[in-house]
Amino acid sequence: PWGGGFIAGVGIGIVQNGACTAYYLPIKHQNGTNFDKRWVLNYVEEICRSQIPKVMHNCMYDMGWLKHEGIKVNGPVYDTQFAAAILDENRMSYSLNNLGKDWIGEGKDENILREAVKSFGLKDPKKDMWRLPPEYVGVYGEQDCITCYNLWKYMEPKLHEEKLWKVFQLEMDLVPLLLEMRGRGIKVNLDQAEKNKVKLKTRLKDLVTSIYSDYGSKVDVWSAESIRLAFDKQNLEYGRTPTGKPSFTKEFLDKHPHELPQRILKARRIEKTISTFYDGMILGHSHNGRIHTELHPLKSDEGGTVGGRFSCSHPNLQQATARDPELTPMVRGMFLPEEGCKWGALDYSSQEPTDYHQMVADMAGIDRKPAKTINLGITYGMGGVKLCHSLGLPTDWVVGKNGNTYEVPGDDGKNLLETYHSKVPFVRGLIDLTANNAQNRGWIRTAGGRLCHFDHWEPVRGYSPAVQGKKAAQEKFENKPIRRAFTHKALNRLIQGSAADMTKLAMREIWKEGIVPMHQMHDELDFSFESESDGNKCKEIMENCMKLEVPILVDAEYGNTWADAVHKW
C-alpha cells in the first residue's frame, strides 16, 4: 500500500466434498469489465469474518492487502509458502507454480497470459496483469486457488509426520503481529535527516579535497585502480586478487596504519551513509513520516533465511550498523518512539552462544580477543584461513595434486588452533557431534523443533561444488564416493535456528500481552514503551519463553531515539 499499489482482483476457492471450485472477481482492471468493488469486498469480508479455515500462499501479502481495505481474517489460516519453507528450507523457489509442479504435478499454463500481454502491447505478464481484461487473468487466478488447496492437502500430513506442526503453528501465530508491526511503522525525524544529509555531503567533499591537497591524488574511493595510483604515489604496499588486480578491501583499509587509507575508508562510510541510509532508507522509504519495513520470517522468493531468523526489506533496517561511533548516531538517531514514550532496546545477552570467552582464554592460555574470535568462528563453521584473516595472522599458499593453488593457515594460526583444541576439547567434541548427526541422518533439529536439512552432496576426496540431491550427485561425480556437504556448519545451524525459535516464541508471548514491538533485528527487539513496567514485562518474557539449563539474560536499555537507547529508565 505504501508503494501506491491496489487490489486488481480477488481469487477465491470454495471447497466442498474435498474438491475446490474457484472464482476470480475483478475490481480494478484497466481494461474489460470489473465487478463493483464494494460488493466484492463485502463478500470477501463475509468469508474472512467466518471461522472456517483459510488456505493461502504468501498470506503476509494477501492479509496485508485485506488489512489495508479494513478486512480482518478470522479463523485458522494455513500458508502453503510457510509450510514449504518449513518442510524444505533449501529450495531454490517457493513460488506457487514451482511448488505445484514439483510436489503435486500441477503447473499453470501461462501461454494464454503471455499471448494476451503481447497482443495488448505490454511486457511483463505479472506486473502488467492488472492492465489486461479480466477474462485473460481469471483462468490464471482460479488455478492458483485450486493449486494452493491441493498443495495444502499434500503438505498438512507431512507437517505432522515430520513433527513440524508446532513450528508451523508458531509461524502462523506471528502473522497478525508482523502485519500490525508493518502497518504501524516506525517514526523517523525527516527534518533532522535532511540536515544531516547536507552536513555529510559537506564532510565528504572536504574529505576528498583533503586527500588531494595532502597527497596530490584525486581519488575515486570505490575504484581500485584510482586507489592504486594514490597508493603508488605514496609508495604504500597493497594486496592483489588471485588474478593479480589491486585489492583494497574494507578489512585491509581498516587495519592499515597510514592516514591515506583511513581517509578513503571514512569517505566510503560517509558516502554509503548518504546513499544507503538517508536516500535509500530514511528519506527514500518514508510515508507520512514513518517507515513501514517488511520482516520475512521464513525463506521465500522475496527474502528470509534458511535457519528461521528474520530478514528485512523495504528498507532493510538490519543494515543500520551500531559499530561506527560517528555515523551510527546520525542514522539510528533518526528513528523515534511514539509521542510520550521511550525507545526500548531489549537485547539477548550472548543468545548464541553465551559469553564464555574469558573462561576459554584462561583454559587455553591465550588472550580473550583471539579466544572470542575462535569460539565464535569455529562454532559458526569458519575455517582456519578465515580465522587467520580475522585475527590478522599470516596464511600460506600451497599447490594441490590437481595443480590448483589453495590458501591454508600459516604456522601461527595452526599453532593457535592446536593449542585451543588441546586445551578446550569440548568445543571440537560438540562440533563433531552435530556434524556426525547431520552426516548420518541428513538433518538436525533445533531447540524449538525446527528441522535443518543437509541434502547437498560432494566427493569424499578432492574438491567440486556440492550438488543438491544424492542421485544428482552420483550422476555428476560418476559414482565416486560421496558424502553430505556443509555438515561442518551443523552447530551453526543448530545455534542460529534455536535462537530464531526463542525470539519468535518471545514475540508470540509479547503479542498475547497486547504489546507490539516496533522492530526485530538480530538478537534485539525494539519497542516504544510508555512505562518501565512494560519493558520489564517484555524482558521477563524474553528470558523465560524457552527454558534452558544455562539461563538466558536480556539487556534492557532505553532512550529518546534508537541511537540513544543506551540508558536505564
Go through the PLM ranges and name each one.
Residues 72-89, 96-101, 353-357:
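Conserved beta-strand -> loop -> alpha-helix junction used to position metal-binding or nucleic-acid-contacting
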Residues 60-71, 84-87, 228-235, 349-352, ...:
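Short active-site loop/helix that positions an aromatic residue
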Residues 56, 77-78, 343-347:
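Short hydrophobic beta-strand that contains or immediately precedes a catalytic carboxylate
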Residues 1-30, 74, 91-94, 101-104, ...:
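Conserved "right-hand" nucleotidyltransferase catalytic core of DNA-directed polymerases
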Residues 540-550:
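A common structural junction motif
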Residues 16-54:
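Nucleic-acid-processing active sites and adjacent nucleic-acid-binding tracks
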